[in-house]
């Protein structure tokens, strides 16, 4: 289960990529905007503020997240619905689809992008941001520490060049780039607290009691060695992939 309060820690660092993505979306009028993996809805709300004339729909499969998002709803202008991205299909063509840090949870990106392209209306736009730090120490140490206890999903995020090729093959114009953010996180065991909000969630759901506490202690020790805390905080490099694809 998603923990909205845990995810909201380091809010500034987590939301910055969204606004970097937003800055590259063609600034024109959109009638229907869909935010896939809307979470607590705060960034969906930002889309509604940026394009006040549009109907904005946030989609998420987590009841916990949607419970928080519902407080922001403005029926007919800003709505939230429960659905799984892997099965989502709009009732009508969409002008702008935004997927901020959500596609990494969905398998088979080639098929996924085909469905997204099919959902776009004329001159429609697909804007995506995904973490691509699965070879970073935080993830490598997670795999090593949990080995044999909990099966972990394989990294399904593709090289950025592969996304360009797939999207161009679908007839879309593509603007793609990568960014490595150098976050300086504050607080004790900051990287552990960060990962608890995302990649660590399935592991914590699978373990319980003493086994869970033993895992957390071992993982925290390894993270402290890989990411030493300094008087200024803990430096945490985080690579992300972005692309904005437009129907010609």
Language-model features, listed with the residues they occupy:
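Short catalytic micro-motifs in class I SAM-dependent methyltransferases
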Residues: 101-102
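A short glycine-rich, Lys/Arg-flanked "PGG" loop and its adjoining helix->strand segment in the class I
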Residues: 110-125
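A short acidic, Gly/Pro-enriched loop at the edge of an enzyme's catalytic core
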Residues: 89-97
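Conserved Class I S-adenosyl-L-methionine
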Residues: 40-42, 156-248
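Conserved class I S-adenosyl-L-methionine
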Residues: 1-34, 42-46, 65-68, 125-150
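Class I SAM-dependent methyltransferase SAM/SAH-binding core
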Residues: 32-88
């Amino acid at each position: 289960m998603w923990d909205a309060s845990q995810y909201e820690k380091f809010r500034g660092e987590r939301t910055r990529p969204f606004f970097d993505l937003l800055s590259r979306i063609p600034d024109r009028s959109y009638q229907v905007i869909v935010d896939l993996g809307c979470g607590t809805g705060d960034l969906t709300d930002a889309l509604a503020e940026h394009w006040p004339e549009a109907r904005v729909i946030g989609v998420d499969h987590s009841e916990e997240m949607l419970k928080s998002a519902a407080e922001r709803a403005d029926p007919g202008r800003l709505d939230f619905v429960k659905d799984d991205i892997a099965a989502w299909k709009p009732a009508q063509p969409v002008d702008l689809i935004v997927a901020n840090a959500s596609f990494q949870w969905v398998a088979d990106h080639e098929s996924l992008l085909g469905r997204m392209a099919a959902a776009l209306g004329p001159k429609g736009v697909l804007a995506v941001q995904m973490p691509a730090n699965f070879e970073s120490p935080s993830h490598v140490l997670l795999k090593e520490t949990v080995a044999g206890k909990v099966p972990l999903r394989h990294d399904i995020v593709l090289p950025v060049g592969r996304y360009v090729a797939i999207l161009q093959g679908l007839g879309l114009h593509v603007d793609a780039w990568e960014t490595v953010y150098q976050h300086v996180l504050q607080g004790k065991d900051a990287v552990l607290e960060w990962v608890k909000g995302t990649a660590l969630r399935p592991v914590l759901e699978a373990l319980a009691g003493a086994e869970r506490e033993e895992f957390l202690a071992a993982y925290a020790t390894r993270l402290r060695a890989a990411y030493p805390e300094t008087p200024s905080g803990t430096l945490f490099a985080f690579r992300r992939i972005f692309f904005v694809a437009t129907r010609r």
